[in-house]
């Protein structure tokens, strides 16, 4: 729709269609159009993917409009351009009596058609489910280009903004890798492993490896009270982990929470060692890992798992389950279960 991916992962590019160029142009025009309404915003990066769009927008000063209002304005402009390209007449002033005053139509539609005079007004006051039914019943051509709503992330600081911009620019490369390597770039919203459910992203085949070794470290050494990663015991453990990895057919399993766990997790990512990382953040339909873990997934060396309802698991030693203390122990208990798991993970299609 917006174009197609060209080249390879080493030299990714998006070859835009006329519609993709129109969407990109609408994005670049946001600051100028919003200035007409007294809103000061800036756009920093954008990319049209074949079937969706990414962009970074900055609000320069407080304004009466919400970000949703601005996004809706851009989406409406794109929809109108799409209609023009396809020779579809605008629907904004079409009277509802043309196709709504029909006794065979649902009662809710006839009631709303009596309230809102134009098609545009009517559409704005329908729920997503009602709109979908309306398009089917009435057979309208004037469907919106974009889905309802949008997925957003709030930028925290300048470093976060630069990471956002880098992510936007990296999208074509990521998409090429996902298409080229579907087996090791899977996103599954429901995977059952042993007695627990997870969201997953990456190489699910790592669960089949016979030798799964847990990396678990407390923050302090139980005898000396030293930071555990600074002790001789940790050095010996790490040497054993590395020996197991280099011996072959071994995958590390860890949440990477304590400093000692984090150091080993990062070494696996940097050196391409097989790793199952159990994280506390959930994996939804739009979730993707940051670049380092994404590339590890592309190399087939990483599986990211996110347990369902982590904060509803058992409290540990009377400490609430949504505390860092209980999360640390519960995630490591899950790592123990995964290491002993030798069955087949059950994947539920969603």
Go through each PLM region and give its residues.
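Short catalytic/metal-binding and nucleic-acid-binding patches
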Residues: 1-188
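Glycine-biased, small-residue-rich flexible motifs in mid-sequence functional cores and linkers
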Residues: 186-350
């Amino acid at each position: 729709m917006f174009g197609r991916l060209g080249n390879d992962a080493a030299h990714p590019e998006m070859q835009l269609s006329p519609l993709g160029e129109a969407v990109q142009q609408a994005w670049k025009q946001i600051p100028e159009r919003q200035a007409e309404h007294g809103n000061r915003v800036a756009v920093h990066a954008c990319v049209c993917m074949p079937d969706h769009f990414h962009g970074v927008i900055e609000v320069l000063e407080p304004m009466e409009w919400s970000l949703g209002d601005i996004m809706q304005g851009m989406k409406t402009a794109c929809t109108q351009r799409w209609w023009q390209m396809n020779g579809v007449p605008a629907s904004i002033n079409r009277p509802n009596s043309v196709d709504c005053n029909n006794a065979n139509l649902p009662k809710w539609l006839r009631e709303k058609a009596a309230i809102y005079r134009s098609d545009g007004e009517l559409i704005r006051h329908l729920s997503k489910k009602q709109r979908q039914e309306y398009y089917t019943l009435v057979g309208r051509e004037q469907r919106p280009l974009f889905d309802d709503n949008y997925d957003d992330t709030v930028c925290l600081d300048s470093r976060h903004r630069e990471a956002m911009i880098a992510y936007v620019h990296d999208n074509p490369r990521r998409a090429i890798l996902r298409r080229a390597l579907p087996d090791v770039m899977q996103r599954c919203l429901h995977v059952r492993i042993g007695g627990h459910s997870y969201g997953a992203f990456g190489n699910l085949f790592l669960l089949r490896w016979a030798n799964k070794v847990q990396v678990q470290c407390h923050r302090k050494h139980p005898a000396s009270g030293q930071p555990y990663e600074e002790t001789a015991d940790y050095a010996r453990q790490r040497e054993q982990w590395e020996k197991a990895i280099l011996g072959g057919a071994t995958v590390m399993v860890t949440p990477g929470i304590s400093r000692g766990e984090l150091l080993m997790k990062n070494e696996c990512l940097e050196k391409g060692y097989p790793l199952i990382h159990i994280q506390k953040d959930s994996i939804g339909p739009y979730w993707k890992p940051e670049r380092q873990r994404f590339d590890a997934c592309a190399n087939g060396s990483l599986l990211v798992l996110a347990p369902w309802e982590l904060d509803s698991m058992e409290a540990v030693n009377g400490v609430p389950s949504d505390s860092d203390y209980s999360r640390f122990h519960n995630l490591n208990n899950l790592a123990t279960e995964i290491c002993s798991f030798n069955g087949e993970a059950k994947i539920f299609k969603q």
